[in-house]
Amino acid sequence: MYGLILSRFNNCGYHCYETILIDVFDILSKYMDDIDMIDNENKTLLYYAVDVNNIQFAKRLLEYGASVTTSRSIINTAIQKSSYQRENKTRIVDLLLSYHPTLETMIDAFNRDIRYLYPEPLFACIRYALILDDDFPSKVSMISPVIIRN
């Protein structure tokens, strides 16, 4: 499937390719038992769509019920790929976050190598993780006096 997501049809540009891929997927999805099926490398279709930064295909997979928590490295991959974009750095990250990954998925994303990445996608994930953390308001009250004193 990775080759299908990466390959481009010869006679049309990228936009045409994306449309054809989504049309083919719409037809094939009727015959799929599990949209989150995992290949022999433990990766899902959503992982591959994120890996090649195919936002429209990732969005379609999510609309069909693909889970952002099935493959633990999806969020981390999105953060890394977003860091290489010149424009709309957080677009793929924001898309994935809009489908509510679990706090465990967010923690796992930050347990991977993120040292050399641009801050925008990281900040989006941190904001989302803080929203999920039930204890965060109490942590803010502990941090605020320290910030005010300095």
From Swiss-Prot:
The keyword Translocase does not apply. InterPro entries: Ankyrin_rpt, Ankyrin_rpt-contain_sf. Gene3D superfamilies: Ankyrin repeat-containing domain (1.25.40.20). ANK repeats lie at residues 41-73. The keyword Methyltransferase does not apply. Keywords: ANK repeat. SUPFAM superfamilies: Ankyrin repeat. Signal peptide: none annotated. This is Ankyrin repeat protein C18/B24. It comes from Vaccinia virus (strain Copenhagen).
